[in-house]
Amino acid sequence: MKANVYSMEGEVKEEIELPAIFNEEYRPDLIKRAVISAQTARVQPWGNDPEAGKRTSAKGWGSGRGTARVPRIKNGSKAAFVPMAVGGRRAHPTRAEKNHHEKINIKERRFAIRSAVAATANKELVENRGHRLGDLEQVPIIVEDDICSVKTTKQTREIFQNLGVYDDITRAKEGKRIRAGRGKTRGRKYKKVKGPLLVVGEDNGIKLGARNHAGVDVVTVENLNAELLAPGTHPGRLTIFTKSAVEKLGGLFQ
């Protein structure tokens, strides 16, 4: 498979042969597992206090009193300790020692990344994911390495406009909305839309230049993962590769 390399002005500079990773088999099931594995690896353990509801000297009266044989507090008849009692323990409490991480085999994870990279070259998948492609002739977009040294938002805005992906950044900006439900009070007030992903051979300042654009993520090719390529487990993210990143991809994730 061949692809054009664009300059920062949006003009075709040359044509290169894409590595075999872009022809990998499409496996949405593996991609989903790899993304969920990455998400659950960040989960903070939570659980109830093991002593909750048990801090009492309640003791049962036994039979023969015409009342339920449940533990009752001393100097009174109020039930305690048991799950059905007010202030009693929980029947099956959450436990902090539970491991929430859903693991995945190393070879499967690498296969998932390769498959997600190949999905970025499928125009139909990228469109179905909701990205605005406009007049784009090819996906993924490959740009010259000079972009790695761009350090300002103004410059990156002009480059994205020249490459034809700024409409998708606008979509991400307009898609920010307040979350429904209790999550608003738990540090995740807004739901945000993912825009283009920029994969670079090395970071010489481009992260500073692109971080202020809504929905844009920047990553070096060595740190590429399934969650960046398929946010929310949905493959086909609009992706911009630098030429050096494409060259390095051929020897990674094997």
From Swiss-Prot:
Gene Ontology BP terms: translation
Pfam families: Ribosomal_L4
Keywords for this protein: Ribonucleoprotein, Ribosomal protein, RNA-binding, rRNA-binding
Segments of this protein annotated with the region Disordered: 45-70
InterPro entries, alphabetized: Ribosomal_uL4 (IPR002136), Ribosomal_uL4_dom_sf (IPR023574), Ribosomal_uL4_euk/arc_CS (IPR013000), Ribosomal_uL4_euk/arch (IPR045240), Ribosomall_uL4-arc (IPR019970)
GO terms assigned for molecular function: rRNA binding; structural constituent of ribosome
Gene Ontology cellular component annotations, sorted alphabetically: ribonucleoprotein complex; ribosome
Keyword hit for Metal-binding: no
Family membership: Belongs to the universal ribosomal protein uL4 family.
Subunit-level organization: Part of the 50S ribosomal subunit.
Its biological purpose: One of the primary rRNA binding proteins, this protein initially binds near the 5'-end of the 23S rRNA. It is important during the early stages of 50S assembly. It makes multiple contacts with different domains of the 23S rRNA in the assembled 50S subunit and ribosome.
Entry-linked PANTHER family: 60S RIBOSOMAL PROTEIN L4 (PTHR19431)
NCBIfam families listed in its UniProt record: rpl4p_arch
UniProt-recorded name of the protein: Large ribosomal subunit protein uL4
Organism: Methanobrevibacter smithii (strain ATCC 35061 / DSM 861 / OCM 144 / PS)
Taxonomic lineage from the root: Archaea, Methanobacteriati, Methanobacteriota, Methanomada group, Methanobacteria
